[in-house]
């Protein structure tokens, strides 16, 4: 138990109902939890054991100041666990005394058998506006070579506090590096929606994007919201996209079916599958997730043929409009690479997202810390070596 002001803070396991009620409360909403910290995410991740923890004056009565979904993965041959809080915990990072809740959290996880903990603090570190980056591309250039539009003082302060307490940034602190040690993207792309009209959003698109959206409309591309029955077609198109663009997510149809069912059981409509049809054929499919006042474009897939009718642009424009209509403050297009080199294959994804007129955000990334004791430190080193071999 740690004091907060004049009131002690208690950390303990809480029910999913209590957890969700906090996320939906004004205080919880202000902390901006992502879908990876919702209780439903535990049902998506096979092979992990989940803990729902809360802290505050009286967690069991719902008097909370923060919560965390913790995923535990057992280290082979031991009774020890790696504790992972994807894009969490959901906490007030503005509090300079992070020990008041972080200390009890780490102690609880140590007693639960964790040998190390990985967290994903929510504050941003740097931001680059699309208008700034477009003229600054070139051979060998990376985001870190460009002076940011904004450096977030909170992100800088949180990073310093974590380092002072023995945390290490996964993948290191290299300028412009993509955060290869992170499980979640270090660089993401945001389109602000708060205070903007749909006309503002349209004006924010670059000329190429507006032309492509109009082309899709002229060609008769129809955008509809699908259902779970359309997930097999989404996965088929995703396999096509992976082959074409040279990446591999490694997620099966069963994974997406589990995700769709779990997120929508928690809140109907939380995850939607958008389809772009042309002449009766599905040419592209994208997933949209909403939590509170945030919306995420999670995964996109498209066919190799008839790309000239621009189904993906049509999908994204519809999804932007729907997120705006739902009252979202931010549309998160998820990960982008750090390269500004048009000669690199990965740059195409960044270029496409820049066309929406948003901004690249460098998050604080993920941070790890072994929990006290030589045995835990040794297990952590062995676990890091295991991850590098994968």
What are these regions (language model features)?
Residues 104, 259-378:
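Aromatic (often tryptophan-rich) hydrophobic motifs at membrane interfaces
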Residues 82-84:
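Catalytic phosphate/metal-binding cores of nucleic-acid and nucleotide-processing enzymes, i.e., regions
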């Amino acid at each position: 138990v740690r004091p907060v002001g004049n009131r002690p803070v208690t950390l303990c396991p809480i029910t999913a109902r209590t957890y969700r009620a906090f996320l939906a409360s004004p205080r919880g909403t202000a902390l901006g939890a992502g879908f990876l910290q919702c209780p439903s995410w535990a049902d998506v991740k096979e092979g992990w054991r989940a803990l729902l923890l809360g802290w505050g004056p009286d967690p069991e009565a719902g008097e909370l100041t923060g919560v965390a979904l913790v995923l535990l993965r057992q280290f082979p041959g031991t009774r020890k666990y790696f504790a992972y809080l994807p894009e969490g915990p959901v906490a007030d990072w503005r509090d300079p005394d992070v020990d008041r809740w972080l200390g009890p959290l780490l102690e609880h996880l140590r007693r639960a058998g964790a040998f190390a903990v990985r967290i994903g603090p929510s504050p941003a570190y740097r931001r680059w506006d699309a208008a700034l980056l477009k003229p600054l591309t070139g051979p060998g250039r990376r985001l870190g070579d460009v002076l940011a539009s904004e450096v977030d003082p909170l992100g800088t302060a949180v990073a310093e506090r974590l380092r002072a307490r023995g945390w290490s940034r996964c993948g290191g602190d290299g300028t412009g590096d993509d955060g290869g040690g992170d499980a979640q993207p270090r660089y993401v792309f945001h389109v602000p929606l708060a205070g903007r009209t749909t006309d503002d959003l349209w004006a924010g698109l670059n000329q190429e994007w507006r032309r492509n959206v109009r082309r899709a409309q002229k060609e008769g591309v129809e955008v509809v919201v699908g259902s779970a029955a359309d997930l097999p077609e989404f996965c088929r198109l995703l396999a096509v996209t992976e082959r074409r663009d040279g990446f591999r997510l490694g997620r099966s149809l069963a994974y997406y079916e589990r995700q769709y069912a779990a997120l929508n059981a928690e809140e109907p409509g939380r995850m939607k599958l958008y389809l772009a049809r042309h002449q009766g054929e599905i040419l592209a499919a994208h997933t949209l997730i909403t939590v509170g006042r945030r919306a995420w474009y999670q995964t996109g897939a498209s066919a190799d043929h008839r790309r000239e009718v621009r189904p993906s642009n049509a999908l994204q424009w519809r999804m932007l409009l729907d997120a705006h209509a739902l009252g979202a403050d931010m549309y998160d297009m998820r990960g982008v690479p750090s390269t500004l080199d048009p000669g690199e294959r990965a740059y195409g994804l960044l270029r496409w997202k820049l066309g929406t007129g948003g901004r690249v955000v460098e998050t604080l990334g993920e941070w790890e810390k072994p929990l006290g004791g030589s045995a835990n430190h040794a297990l952590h080193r062995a676990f890091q070596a295991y991850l590098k071999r994968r």
